[in-house]
Amino acid sequence: SPLTVVALPDFLIDHFPLKSTAEFVRLDGLTCDRRDLSQLQAVTEWLSVHLGDGETAYMITDDMLYNPGHLRNCLLPEQPLDGKLPDSFSVPGTHNFPMSFFEAKYVLTADPFPLSYASPTELGHRLNAKFLELRDSTHQQVATFDMGNGTVFTIWERTAPVTREEVETYLHE
């Protein structure tokens, strides 16, 4: 795959569980062979039309199959989401607390979540779970996109101003 280069000696390959190896190969194939490119472009175009000057969106999902970079770059050479779709939050010590999540006009979620190997305790999972729990009091659903591979993206628009209590709820998750 152009996105994932793995060179392992044969003795290591024999020690990988076949089920996890098969799942990696499946996800890697989906990443390389973008049969959902038109759907990615549709999500990007929807956001481009609905985000005004100074407005942003936040994508909770951040893995090898779907991440903000895929949406920012799916219409190359045009990049209509540059400056409008920041990187997501998932790696402690590397990514800062996602203030851009609270500043975003729109939040993108994916179902099913997760889409790759990240554990349920990974920060993106925890942010997604808390968002799903609280979304009805802060956001409303405005669009969905079937990616054609079992994944559905939902776009949620913020309907209530951010409160200190909301930020602290996510911070202490």
Residue ranges and their predicted role:
Residues 1-2, 163:
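Short, acidic Gly/Pro/Ser/Thr-rich loop/turn segments
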Residues 50, 71, 155-157:
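A generic structural signal for ordered secondary structure
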Residues 53, 58-104, 115-132:
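Extracytoplasmic
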Residues 102-173:
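Aromatic/acidic, Gly/Pro-rich catalytic loop(s) in extracytoplasmic/lumenal soluble domains
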